Amino acid sequence: MAEQYDAIIIGAGIIGASVGLELARRGWRTLNVDRLPAAGYGSTSASCAIIRSHYSTLDGTALAFEGYQYWRHWSEHLGVADERGLARFEEVGCAVMKTSSNGYLKSICENLDTLGILWEDWDNETLKKRLPIYDLRSFAPAKLPDNPGFGEATGPAIAGAAFMPQAGYISDPQLATHNVQVAAEAAGAKFRFNTNVTKIRQVDNAVRGITLA
């Protein structure tokens, strides 16, 4: 028997589940379909779950910084409790080294300044004090372990770093996705797992539905 939805989202990782949540909150009848057994079991679970705002484009930086606000206020964003608990945002900051290959972060720091995002300019003395285990020598370009010169310094010290305090990581990306699923279901969204999509049906170049295995 065919089921009718306003939107069908293929995938229930952190992106797919979030799409379902936001559409459901706007009154759409949504269905997330995933071939895996639970939300966030695919590439989301393999994610290092870094939350950062330093990107090469202004639009990307602005979008990331908006997302950072949701992670900071995760409980308020979800609006519901999850019996498994909530994922934590560990706001430890992020240091990025300045090198010739990344333009010494000039354009990235300009984007941060334009949007009023906090960052600190660390010289090598500060970097060594804050991260004493760090080797400040340059090893670029990257080499494979069996290449000649692997692990050998190739140049002088790096040129310091930019430190962004409004950054960190999520304690458990799969749990975070389950949190989103619970919030989406509270808003009326539906999820189907262990389900393979075999066809995306189209009529007159418009998607009309999906066929399941």
Give the ranges of each region predicted by the language model.
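Beta1/beta-strand and adjacent pyrophosphate-binding region of the FAD-binding site
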Residues: A2-I15, L31
